Amino acid sequence: MGIRTVEEYKQSLRDGRKVYISGEKVEDVTRHRVLGLTVDTIGAGYEMAATDDKAIRDLLVASHPETGEPINRFFVTPKSAEDLRNRTRLIHSLMRTTGGLPFGKDIGTDCLNAAMAVARQMGNKQYEDNAKNFLEHLRKNDLHTCGAITCVKGDRSREPSQQKHPDYYLHVVDKNKDGIVVKGAKIHITSAPAANEILVVPTRQMRENEADYAVSFAIPANTEGITFICRNGRGPWSDKEFHPDRPVRELTEAMIVFDNVLVPWDRVFMCGEWQHSMHLAYTFATFHRFTAISYKVPSVEVMAGCAVAMAKYNGLFKVGHIREKLADIAAYVETLRALANAAANDPVMFGDIAVPNPLIANMAKLHFASKYHDFVKLIQDIGGGILATAPDKKDWDNPDIHGYLEHYLGGAKEYSTMERLQMIHETMRHVCSHESAFHEVTTVHAEGSMAAQKMMILHESPLKKYEERAKVAAGILPWGSVK
């Protein structure tokens, strides 16, 4: 098949999967008020890949490295810095063209790329072949994948083997000739209810007595024993909103319950190799944080643009303290962009697989997460109190009060009141809404906590070299002894 149409993708989701949202069992995720938005957001990526626009199609569609047949570019295993740069360009283009993030293949391939790289380093040919064969399955059928990493964890102060319930961490409960049987739950899984395949990797390092928790595999979303319990979302645009002429773009997260799920042996990428569990989790995190910083650049560009526009609409663009805030906003965005580019340009090679530079990728994610709330505060400051108290579109459309709003809510004379209100509502969505509060939390915790990023930065940084150079400077070591 190679490249699917959006309708083929939607039809593939009508497969009997077990999905719940707000206590309701969903028979067809493609037609649900909230989950349908996730399907359409991902579907926008399929629409772009099937377009007649050659420039867009060339970005999304690549040639199979062996057969030359068309495949989605996300299914190109990165072998060079250029492959990583192409992945970033692809994510940027998808966001800027569709108005959202069609997270249909990004996280799943982060998992699979990590599984292939680690299987190779383990020297386990069976796992490596399983991963390669599964990649061919994805390429041939153009499937949407989600990555299931975070376990529910229970008491965070206790190891997996010390939990009150052993299935607070997903683990193997049985093995037979057909495969492994797993039990547990993964949580915060983006776009899970609209995925064709689920890729599972360990959430952390496991100990020798936790070998059953060191497990990685791929499984179809409609497999018996799998249940999705989804976060409710915002739903379509309402008549109260000033909104752009495009659909709402939103991705729904889910907790995935694995209740004694049978995974065939040929879909297993790790089973019991606890010594390598951290390596797999670590490698996935590097790939995924690179994906994260790639999609966050166009996201914060829009937010920065809101600040610039609001400064102009409010007549304050040339005021000194506003320009100082805009400089801080621009520095935040451009530092993130520079770090994202650097992570792609200086990869670490795992055999012939190019892994984004782990130190720089984690620095970039830490920069984004640790400074995001200050970034939001700057936009709120520039936008003004109107971000919290603005009238809605139904007020604007009411002829009894429209004149008052038109008259009193104008700003700088170069701009219409309508244009100012449109930008106010756009800015509200980013910094003063239920959606913005959601993103303030996910910025801290998605793709791993700031503590996890600091841990990886410390691990990757050449601390010994820093120390040796200081000793040379102090005369403790001879001059020229440290390269």
Regions found by a protein language model. Name each.
Residues 147, 152-295, 458-483:
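FAD-binding core of flavoproteins
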Residues 291-349:
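Extended amphipathic alpha-helical segments enriched in small hydrophobics
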Residues 36, 40, 136-139, 181, ...:
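Generic structural signal for well-ordered, non-transmembrane alpha-helical segments
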Residues 47-145, 197:
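Internal helix-loop-helix
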Residues 1-46:
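N-terminal-proximal low-complexity accessory segments that begin disordered
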Residues 43-46, 311, 333, 337-340, ...:
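A structural signal for well-ordered alpha-helices, especially hydrophobic packing surfaces
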Residues 359, 363-483:
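Alpha-helix capping/hinge segments and adjacent helical runs
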Residues 346-364:
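Short secondary-structure subsegments characteristic of cysteine-rich extracellular domains
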